[in-house]
Amino acid sequence: MNNVQDVNFAAPSATIFSIFSVAKTISKSTAPYMENIRLRFAPSPTGPLHIGGVRTALYNYLLARKHGGTFLLRVEDTDQSRFVPGAEAYIIEALEWLGMQPDEGPGFGGDYGPYRQSERQELYQKYTQQLLDQGDAYYAFDTAEELEQQRQADVTFKYDAGARLQMRNSLSMKPEEVEKALADGTPYVIRLKVPENETVLFTDEVREEVAFDTSELDDKVLMKADGMPTYHMANIVDDHLMEITHVIRGEEWLSSTAHHVLLYRFLGWEDDMPSFAHLPLLLKPSPESYLDKQSIPKMAKRMAEEFANRHPEQGQGYESKAEHFALQAFQDKKNLASHLKEKDKDDAQKAAFKVFLKDAMFGKLSKRDGDRLGFPVFPLSWKGASASDSFVGFREYGFLPEATLNFLALLGWNPGGEQELFEKEELTQAFSLERVNKAGTKFNIDKARWFN
């Protein structure tokens, strides 16, 4: 298939298709450009910085330093409902502890600011208006209740070319109706108008050529009802205006890249589009690495209590049964995943608990896994509003910043050869996107301790 990956990734609402069965192909090669490179780390201040985010920052930092480029920090704080006081300061402190001080960003200066998205609203409004004027975006007046009704009626519903004319928006309404709705102050969002019968094709530095059929893409919201941009709009505008040459981010954003390529095209910036690199997921460690005779009873009790707290509808009496089942299942930790998939003679409570255990012990590493499994998943300690939102970090566990960087660098990147211990400068010179793995990488706390 011309090296096009025809696979599904863990990302929302998009499937990769062959490029041969569609009427038109949009293609953009993003070969590495290594002169005057500019990379950004762009976290959202919604809480403590997860170790997966630190790895993303590290890969951006290493590539920038290797080629004498610029590493900048941009704070993506457009979702004010999720803003957490102190989170931005935490992010900066974590980067500085690890020796990754940005060249530009809030508090660091730079010629491309402001570096907080909440301070750049006029720019987003300007370019959103351009898309509206060109017919590449449209007003949508649907209420949250109306959208929920659509989802209840059809679980596969998505707001796309097939559905948009059945909804309340400036494409389905008469011009005078749209004018009246706007004049009356009717709440609206602005959506991207995804074209029909096209394939969006781009080159990812990790995953090679990737293709998305636009029939599988929804019309993403670009501007919310509160006048703030979504990630998609703000991200593209900022990356272009800040002259970002490489976008290194997590795999969960891979499907969104199709929308971003369209936005670059519609805004006339396609020739300046950055290179993309989507990093593999960080996965939970194998249960074999942390379950032993001493930890199994504690883990079984913890899982049963957490299940009971999250699912009170299962009844208070089930907690002891859940603990007993977990104790039995954990004894055969090597085949735990298989046991949790078995459904023979399961009652509803047991089936629900098995699903909970599967999600808790396998899959993507989450911020709750540190307390749950007994190791840090944050660089620094974080004190939240409650005990359940407070975490101990690598620094407080006694890890050195150099050891933490070395450990994180090898979570998804293979330097080749036998060397595992790297000084920071050695990491900088050795790092390349070409040796970043496609498959997810399991977190291994024993390996982290070895580096320390």
Task: Tell me what each language-model feature is.
Residues 139, 143-362, 366-367, 372, ...:
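Active-site cores that bind ATP or allylic diphosphates and position pyrophosphate for catalysis
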Residues 60, 91, 131, 135, ...:
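Residue-level signal for inorganic ion chemistry
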Residues 104-126:
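Aromatic/His-enriched, Gly/Pro-containing loop or helix-boundary segments
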Residues 33-94, 220, 225-256:
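N-terminal catalytic cores of NTP/NDP-binding nucleotidyl/phosphoryl-transfer enzymes
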Residues 4, 8-9, 16-48, 66-71, ...:
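Non-catalytic terminal extensions that flank enzyme cores
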Residues 89-112:
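A glycine-rich helix N-cap at a beta->alpha junction
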Residues 115-123, 280-290, 429, 434:
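Short, conserved secondary-structure transition motifs
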